[in-house]
Amino acid sequence: FSDMERIAEEGYYEMVNMRLSKCGGFRNSLKMIDYLRDHGISFQVGCQLGESGLLSAAGRALSLLCSDAVYYDGSYDEFLLQENVTLEHVSFGPGGEAGPLKGHGLGVEISHRNLERLRDPSTAVTMSRP
């Protein structure tokens, strides 16, 4: 969050690219966006290149909460990924149109078969309850 404060204090930025995956999730993203709004700094809802359908769906939800964003970026998964971890395609439609996704939560279901096949076992973390 200190980056946002520095950006506001220095006054060098007219717009900030807000990426849900870089900001620590919904709560932090919305907190930072509110801070930008309070300081008169424009923002766009951005994305990471090659996001899966799950992150695209999350970005879509954030975009729908931020009608004052200057630009919306994301939902490229169908155009960039050979395989996805979601059952639904969440890529934008003709003219870049992308509205709310139907269904519960983020509006997507995970393909457990694809997730298992696409995961990188070398990065797996084992967690146990205390």
Which residue ranges define each predicted feature?
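C-terminal extensions of enzymes
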Residues: 79-130
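Shared catalytic-loop signature of beta/alpha-barrel
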Residues: 1-97
